[in-house]
From Swiss-Prot:
Subcellular localization, as worded in the UniProt entry: Mitochondrion inner membrane
Homology family: Belongs to the COQ4 family.
Membrane topology: Peripheral membrane protein
Note: This protein may be expected to contain an N-terminal transit peptide but none has been predicted.
Descriptive protein name: Ubiquinone biosynthesis protein coq4, mitochondrial
Organism: Talaromyces marneffei (strain ATCC 18224 / CBS 334.59 / QM 7333) (Penicillium marneffei)
Gene it is expressed from: coq4
GO cellular-component term (any): extrinsic component of mitochondrial inner membrane
Spans traversing the lipid bilayer: none
Keywords: Lyase, Membrane, Metal-binding, Mitochondrion, Mitochondrion inner membrane, Ubiquinone biosynthesis, Zinc
EC number: 4.1.1.130
Amino acid sequence: MPPPPRTALLAASSRCLKCYEIGLKYASRNFSALNRPLPNYPGHVPLNRIERGVLAIGSAFGSLINPYRHDLIAALGEATATPYFIYRLRDAMLSNPTGRRILRDRPRITSETLKLPYLRNLPENSVGWTYAKWLDKEGVTPDSRDSVQYIDDEECAYVMQRYRECHDFYHAVTGLPTMVEGELALKAFEFLNTVLPMTGLSLAAVVRLKPAERERFFKLHLPWAVRSGLSSEELINVYWEEQLERNVDDLRTELGIETPPDLREIRRMMRQQEKRAKEQQAQGSSS
């Protein structure tokens, strides 16, 4: 793959600036619930600027209170992605041969399209086997992703949907679990890789971590996220459906992603240390 096209995270192409102006014009239209424009695609909900702002603020506070409200996180992602950031991500796909193919083919990631029983029977350490194993271990399914509603441009709505559906592949290739600590590490990586504001805003949930977890995040996983996020290829351009039989280690190397510290193993070792410390304390007090 060629080097990442982003030399600066917020550098914009002329196409992106033009799309920004178009999106800003659309967002500033004076409409209300009585004269709302027709939807641009099935499920689309047009919003004016005030409604988009209210949605962003409300979903941000709601997702901070409950990080497992995926519907609020999805709404936050859409409300803050326009009028600039989702166009930047779309332009990154247009500037990449594989990204252009994805935009042309419009593949969807579901348990049916991926044929999960087939993935479970692939060789160990293949991308597909790793993905299916991660889904089973975490108890999640690719069918649970919310549909995009609040992105006005139909093509950009697909880009957001594609990012959303690929999220579990990012989990699988990094090995990060769905617990809050793992999600924060992945969101930090995604922010530097995609520049979507929601991924950066999600890091506010670090205040919900326990002191030991917060210290571990800043010492181990945040430095990993910065290194890998800045040096890796743009993951939106990965045609995951064509990588399923590849060795996951080879793909990680090709994409420029370091393997992060094993969060589950770290937490297991910490629990064992705490258990031994309590046992020693109990023995000392009884002697």
